[in-house]
């Protein structure tokens, strides 16, 4: 009987993959045979998840990265390509929400941090990875948005705006890159512990 998801020979780069949704995605993709790149800001959790995947029989590398910093993102892609030679799957999962409360009370600095990390970081990473996928004949991009991007919220409104921007980015990239055999989707999960 064949496996439903066989990712043998595929390389998956997953941001924010040391806990929660990102970690679960990395573990499942590794179990399906993908070579996975574990990434988040802090090196130690990256290493721990990477080693756990290897102990379970998977193949993984750890590349710490702050997705709000363009140089970090370029390095993440460069190290992935150096290790595995290609990127078949990109999961943009990393995000930040340092402030809770009404958008009207948000400082410019907090707005910039949320938008730079969540929306601009995803934009930068996709623009770096998509041409690499095109060189290899195609690929898949999954942008983890949020239900907060689909409805207003007085507590996490700016986070929601950033996630709505990610969903819109996914729609645009799907139109631009779909004819080149690159599928781009956005998923909008609800609250996760």
Listing of model-derived features with the role each one plays in the protein:
Residues 34-49:
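Conserved glycine-rich Rossmann-like NAD(P)H-binding loop of the short-chain dehydrogenase/reductase
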Residues 11, 18-19:
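Conserved glycine-rich cofactor-binding loop
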Residues 2, 106, 152-160, 172:
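Active-site loop-to-helix junction immediately N-terminal to the catalytic Tyr of the SDR YXXXK motif
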Residues 131, 175-179:
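Alpha-helical segment proximal to the catalytic Tyr-Lys
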Residues 126, 162-165, 170:
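Active-site helix of classical SDR
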Residues 146:
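Residue(s) in the substrate-gating loop at a strand-loop-helix junction
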Residues 101-103, 107-112:
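Substrate-binding pocket helix/loop in short-chain dehydrogenase/reductase
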